[in-house]
């Protein structure tokens, strides 16, 4: 079977965006990365793509290799009309809960764009309150809209880079090995080395895990 080109992969996503643009004009795609892990920020990105300078290969970032995501990240940053990346830290997640923290991050990302869009497309099934323009949720939006897919890549790569730096600073937690999810190894390392400020304490409590004296 012939392997599809990047242009062929992205064609349906750009066709979707063209239909949206024909109705609303300028619009932004928004997505997040890192809602589920035990530590680190949730990262949110908003992106307005330039239809005259497409970025081929865009798709749901989870379906792309790390090498491909990195290459797309650089191209999106170069070609996008506007983009904004926001990190929402564990302190905000613990205070507001992960859903509200993510919604707040989405609002910040949209408000931080250099261009004000007429519409915002949000990956998922809900939209943040308080936006000054219409917003629509798009289930599996990162595999439906090129703009949401681009935001997905920006968010995923930004968070991955952040977590790789944490892994270098705190090698004893082996963050790269367990991908910061609630694995047996991860809990054992937390019990041994304690809870650092980058951990989401509300997530540890929800999992019924709270090391005594740590």
Where are these regions (language model features)?
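RNase H-like, Mg2+-dependent phosphodiesterase core
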Residues: 1-214
